[in-house]
Regions:
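Long, low-complexity, intrinsically disordered polar/charged segments
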Residues: 1-29
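Aromatic- and glycine-rich peptidoglycan recognition patches
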Residues: 2-12, 54, 60-62, 69-70, ...
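Extracytoplasmic/secreted envelope proteins and their assembly/folding machinery
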Residues: 14-18, 22, 42-46, 121
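Catalytic cysteine-centered active-site loop
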Residues: 23, 27-77, 129
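Short, surface-exposed beta-edge/turn micro-motifs
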Residues: 77-78, 87-89
């Protein structure tokens, strides 16, 4: 899924989503939170995507039903990254890194290949390419 197959508009949107997500680094974790006062993982992803008029469900389980599955090696900026045990979601940034609301650290950027996340990674979800450009 090379990014050079994307339209300029889609590339721009994906980049903008990641830039927006990174603006909230340092915001604390709040169970059930979906605002800059505090986020849980799905509330954070839903909030960021909503800034671009993209409506996502509130839970990771429901987000998993949207878009198309993407293999780890095919992830591109703006894709969702899904984890199990426990269920968790973040936004893929680039170069093996993703942005998410961590229960212990709030909104941070982490490496997908860290032992903790590597063991729990289920797949990516491409939500954006299903939109019309």
């Amino acid at each position: 899924r090379p990014s050079f197959n994307l339209t300029d508009d889609e590339k721009e949107l994906r980049k903008d989503i990641v830039v927006e997500a990174l603006k909230y680094k340092g915001v604390g974790y709040l169970y059930g939170g979906s605002s800059p006062f505090g986020f849980d993982c799905s509330g954070f992803v839903q909030f960021v995507y909503e800034k671009f008029g993209i409506n996502l469900p509130r839970t990771v389980k429901e987000m998993e039903k949207k878009g198309t599955w993407v293999k780890r090696q095919d992830l591109i900026a703006g894709d969702l990254v899904i984890f199990h045990n426990p269920r968790h979601v973040g936004i893929y940034a680039s170069k093996g890194r993703f942005v998410h609301a961590s229960t212990s650290r709030g909104v941070v950027r982490d490496k997908l290949d860290s032992e903790y996340y590597q063991k729990r990674f289920v797949g990516g979800k491409n939500i954006i390419s299903s939109l019309s450009f």
